[in-house]
């Protein structure tokens, strides 16, 4: 197989894999990750003032 045929084969594969498609399963995964991130952020928001207060008491 020469370089041109190999290049065209790889280019076609890339175009097929990166083409526009419906989100489907990736959208569900993204939503779950987003929810987990929000929960971590909210927990950190609540815990950081407590931790900062504990450090201030230890000085």
From Swiss-Prot:
GO terms for biological process: antibacterial humoral response; defense response to fungus; defense response to Gram-negative bacterium; defense response to Gram-positive bacterium; innate immune response; killing of cells of another organism. It is found in: Secreted. Residues 58-59 form a propeptide. Induction: Up-regulated following bacterial infection. Expressed in adults within 6 hours after induction and accumulates over 7-10 days. Hemolymph (at protein level). Keywords: Antibiotic, Antimicrobial, Fungicide, Immunity, Innate immunity, Secreted, Signal. Residues 1-23 form the signal peptide. GO terms for cellular component: extracellular space. InterPro entries: Cecropin, Cecropin_insect. Pfam families: Cecropin (PF00272). Antimicrobial peptide. Antibacterial activity against Gram-negative bacteria E.coli D22 and D31, E.carotovora, K.pneumoniae, P.aeruginosa, S.typhimurium, E.cloacae B12 and X.campestris and Gram-positive bacteria A.viridans, M.luteus, B.megaterium and S.pyogenes. Possesses antifungal activity against F.oxysporum, F.culmorum and N.crassa, C.albicans, C.neoformans and S.cerevisiae. No activity against Gram-negative S.marcescens Db11, Gram-positive B.cereus, B.subtilis, B.thuringiensis, S.aureus and L.monocytogenes, the fungi A.fumigatus and B.bassiana and C.glabrata. PANTHER family: CECROPIN-A1-RELATED. Belongs to the cecropin family. This is Cecropin-A. It comes from Aedes aegypti (Yellowfever mosquito). The gene is CECA.
